[in-house]
Amino acid sequence: GDTITFNKAPEDYTISMELFSEGKIQAGCEAIYKNKEIHIKYINGLQNMLNAMGYNYLNEDDVENALHILKLNTILFPESSNTYDSYGEALRKNGNIEEAIKNYKKSIELNPNNQNGIKVLTELEVQI
């Protein structure tokens, strides 16, 4: 399922979670990026957790923090269609249509059955 489990983790890993809990999103993202192997290893469900956090910010119209988190997710999980789809949505909401299109296209390239990405690109009148 989507349960997030925490294994015994080194100190480096807890720093990012503390930063997030203090609302220091960019610093938290940088801390994860700096020690990405540790975070990926020690947080099962990290991709889903970051995606959910990104959408929480997006839904609160805090697009800047959503962009930090969702971009990080594409870097940590470059083979995931969903990370590009979500980042594309945040970019679109921010008015970065050209970048949004690139991310939706990457998402569809990784998962040709991504109906949301296909729908959005069709709405934007982009050739797929």
Language-model segments: residues:
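Catalytic loop of the DD-peptidase/beta-lactamase superfamily, centered on the K-T-G motif
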Residues: 1-23, 27
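Canonical positions in the second alpha-helix
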Residues: 39, 73, 106-107
